[in-house]
């Protein structure tokens, strides 16, 4: 039996190996001593979450609603939307009878949002939609937080798995739930670009929401259908559900930093420019691989583009919006297979990006946009099928400029997404039974961009020195 041993004396042998390469890497006046830590002091502050209680409109399905940003704190660090979704009971009189199953769509909190924006005296400083929320979550949510994020936005079995007519003692099919959506505005990315609310006394600051109708979010399935039969539930005492769902307790929360009196006095003393991020969404296009498997779409963006995000969305069923594959979900009596293994593939085979009459990217495979580019330039690689990104930045999630291209200076910008064989099968509806492709699928092409811009804080108001 051997006995493990080691002693300090052997370490001096390592120290004695210092030569020319080591002289290049170690020593000198600017070298770091790893065993004597220097404390980097910070200004004195505290932080506190605050509910933004001043609101206009109704925080309900299909409505517009806005919350006023309070100036009670000095800096707004981040915000999130919190809502309570109601319980839903599938009636025994539903159109599919015992074969009826009800569920909410995947990414409920994403798809609740038609558009969200932040305004300063009606000047829109930033906006995003549910497409960007899908892209942003796919490429930036680390694996260690993915389960928690899914819980926040409603991706839990009790809400998105098919539920039958309740059997006593149960009284509801889908339970009531409190859900949260982190709002990915520019000031939430880093405390160094926090919104200086105390320095903006002359701005009426609002976070504005346009919510989708519940019909886009609630799904009634027929588990006995040969081809998936998904419909919007009908409201009525002897129909599918007794009453239309209503949101409750819609609230925007903000996390504020409160600083010292000295720092607060300095906030409004000089002009301050802040590099921020904005989101742009190009008009959506119908994508039909049976008539044109390589369509050419114009994309018109402006400012310094850090990254492009694009996908082909499966639009076969309007109330299943977060589906970017070649197949519809397959429903069984107890579960929904969101990405059936025999049918759910990437609709795009390869993509060409063109501008200035030059192929910037020529016939690049989807594996590059879904795997290789995110591996090097994004915080994470999507776990779901169908997401693509191209980053001009070394790391598009970094606040500091690390690469971009000014699309406002380019002409004739277009993108050509070429259909995969699976997309053609899906569009024709010739897939095998249980594949989600055994009936015709419809699609649309979506492309969004992340860009940099500059905001200026001056004279107690916010503006854009470069529009």
From Swiss-Prot:
Q: Which UniProt keywords apply?
A: Capsid protein, Late protein, T=147 icosahedral capsid protein, Virion
**Residue stretches in coiled coil:** none
Q: Keyword Thylakoid, does the record have it?
A: no
InterPro entries linked: Capsid_N (IPR031654), MCP_C (IPR007542), MCP_C_sf (IPR038519), VP_dsDNA_II (IPR016112)
What subcellular locations does the record give? Virion
Q: Which GO terms describe its molecular function?
A: structural molecule activity
Q: Which GO terms describe its cellular component?
A: T=147 icosahedral capsid
- Disulfide linkages recorded for this protein, renumbered to the chain, are none
Member of which family? Belongs to the NCLDV major capsid protein family.
Name the job this protein performs.
Answer: Major capsid protein that self assembles to form an icosahedral capsid with a T=147 symmetry. Represents around 50% of the total virion protein mass.
Protein name, please? Major capsid protein
- What lineage is this protein's organism placed in? Viruses, Varidnaviria, Bamfordvirae, Nucleocytoviricota, Megaviricetes
Q: Which gene encodes it?
A: MCP
């Amino acid at each position: 039996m051997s006995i493990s041993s080691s002693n300090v004396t052997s370490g001096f042998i390592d120290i004695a190996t210092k030569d020319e390469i080591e002289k290049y890497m170690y020593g000198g006046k600017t070298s770091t001593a790893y065993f004597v830590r220097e404390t980097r002091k910070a200004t004195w502050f505290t932080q506190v979450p605050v509910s933004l209680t001043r609101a206009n409109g109704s925080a309900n399905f299909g409505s517009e609603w806005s919350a006023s940003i309070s100036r009670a704190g000095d800096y707004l660090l981040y915000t999130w939307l919190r809502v309570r979704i109601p319980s839903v009971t599938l009636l025994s009189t539903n159109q599919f009878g015992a074969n009826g199953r009800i569920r909410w769509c995947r990414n409920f909190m994403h798809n609740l949002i038609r558009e969200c924006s932040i305004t300063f005296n009606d000047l829109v400083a930033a906006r995003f939609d549910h497409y960007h929320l899908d892209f942003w979550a796919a490429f930036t949510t680390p694996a260690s937080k993915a389960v928690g994020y899914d819980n926040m936005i409603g991706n839990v079995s009790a809400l998105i798995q098919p539920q039958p007519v309740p059997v006593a003692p149960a009284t509801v099919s889908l339970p009531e739930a409190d859900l949260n959506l982190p709002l990915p505005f520019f000031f939430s990315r880093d405390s160094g670009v926090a919104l200086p609310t105390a320095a903006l006394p002359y701005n009426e600051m609002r976070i504005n929401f346009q919510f989708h109708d519940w019909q886009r979010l609630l799904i009634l399935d027929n588990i006995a259908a040969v081809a998936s039969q998904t419909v919007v539930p009908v409201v009525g005492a002897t129909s599918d559900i007794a009453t239309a769902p209503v949101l409750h307790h819609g609230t925007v929360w903000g996390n504020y930093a409160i600083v010292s009196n000295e720092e607060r006095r300095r906030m409004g003393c000089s002009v301050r420019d802040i590099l921020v991020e904005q989101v742009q969404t190009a008009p959506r296009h119908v994508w039909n691989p049976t008539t044109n498997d390589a369509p050419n779409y114009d994309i018109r963006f402006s400012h310094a583009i850090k990254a492009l995000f694009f996908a082909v969305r499966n639009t076969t069923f309007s109330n299943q919006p977060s589906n970017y594959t070649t197949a519809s979900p397959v429903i069984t009596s107890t579960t929904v297979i969101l990405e059936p293994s025999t049918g759910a593939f990437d609709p795009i085979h390869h993509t060409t990006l063109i501008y200035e009459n030059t192929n910037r990217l020529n016939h690049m495979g989807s594996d590059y946009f879904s795997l290789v580019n995110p591996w090097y330039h994004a915080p994470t690689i999507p776990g779901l099928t169908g997401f693509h990104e191209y980053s001009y930045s070394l790391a598009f999630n970094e606040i500091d400029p690390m690469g971009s291209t000014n699309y406002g200076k380019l002409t004739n910008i277009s993108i050509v997404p070429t259909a995969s064989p699976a997309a053609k099968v899906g569009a024709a509806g010739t897939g095998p039974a249980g594949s989600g492709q055994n009936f015709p699928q419809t699609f649309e092409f979506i492309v969004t961009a992340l860009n940099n811009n500059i905001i200026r804080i001056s004279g107690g108001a916010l503006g854009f020195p470069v529009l």
